[in-house]
Amino acid sequence: AIDATAKLSPYINAGIVSSKWCLVKAKEFNNDMLDDGDKGIVHWVSEILWREFYRHIIYNFPKVSKNLPFIDYTKNIPWNEDSVALQRWKDGKTGIPIVDAGIREMLATGWMHNRLRMIVAMFLSKNLLINWQEGEKFFMTKLIDGDIASNNGGWQWSASTGTDAAPYFRIMNPETQSIKFDPEGEYIKKWVPAVSYTHLRAHETLNH
């Protein structure tokens, strides 16, 4: 459940391997194809391309590296300045199992699956209505593969303030997402063990 990744991003960011090398190897293992064939490889290639795309954005639109959103009018969003809710999110104590599990894994290992990053980011910016930049800064202090361009791009996509962003009305439902990607609740129970001792299903909201 929610762990089928190559985990190469820290090595790419450190310059140990290159994006080009990854694409060459992907073609070798996929009958010389990048956009067809093995679905897992095709998806992996798309993630590498997103990484390069966000580098293009930060190079050509440097304002996104200066604490500004890509979409200008979104800088006027009246964010919720709830320091208590923000801290509970940072501590993995929101009561939403999949959100808390993702945060706790990151705090313990420096890693979080990309799908979880989107779920966690949307929960902060669209459910709690807290400025996405708070999450962007927090992720950069915790992720082992922390990368300014990808981190900024991912957060702005989730908060609907960036280029090619998710529509503002798109909000990932944490419960349905966790049921889809962690149907047995194995991942959640690993990082939020309290779930195992309640009468609730692993995907239901916990009350702290």
Where are these regions (language model features)?
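C-terminal catalytic domain of photolyase/cryptochrome flavoproteins
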Residues: A1-E204
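N-terminal low-complexity segments that are often proline-rich with Ser/Thr-Pro
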Residues: L206-H208
